[in-house]
Amino acid sequence: MTARFMTDPHAMRDMAGRFEMHAQTVEDEARKMWASSQNIAGAGWSGMASATSLDTMGQMNTAFRNIVNMLHSVRDGLVRDANNYEQQEQASQQVLRG
């Protein structure tokens, strides 16, 4: 399998936008799940069942936050690298012009 490297700054920024959309989707779904767990806890669950449910949801919330952080990290890296490619391209063109 041949590896393809992304070197087009515009394509890199487009891809960064996709990662941002994915991060937003994960955040939205995590919020819905958290709200749903609060409704369960308020629907008569008590004691160990409620505590276990909240603990599980807390762990899932942490996992989703980690996923969002990773997606944002990739997004930020793509934008940073796109900017670096453009700066290097401009510097190379200036050198070639003499």
From Swiss-Prot:
Its main location: secreted. Keywords: Secreted, Virulence. The keyword Metal-binding does not apply. Induction: Expression is increased upon phosphate starvation and during infection. Disruption phenotype: Disruption of the gene results in decreased dissemination independent of burden. It comes from the Bacteria. Signal peptide: none annotated. The keyword Secreted applies. SUPFAM superfamilies: EsxAB dimer-like (SSF140453). GO terms for cellular component: extracellular region. It is found in: Secreted. Pfam families: WXG100 (PF06013). Alters the host macrophage cytoskeleton and enhances macrophage motility. Promotes granuloma efflux, extrapulmonary dissemination of infection and bone disease. M.marinum contains the ancestral full-length version of EsxM rather than the truncated inactive version which is present in other modern Mtb lineages, including M.tuberculosis H37Rv. Reconstitution of this ancestral version of EsxM in M.tuberculosis H37Rv alters the migratory mode of infected macrophages, enhancing their motility. Belongs to the WXG100 family. CFP-10 subfamily. This is ESAT-6-like protein EsxM. It comes from Mycobacterium marinum (strain ATCC BAA-535 / M). The lineage of its organism: Bacteria, Bacillati, Actinomycetota, Actinomycetes, Mycobacteriales. The gene is esxM.
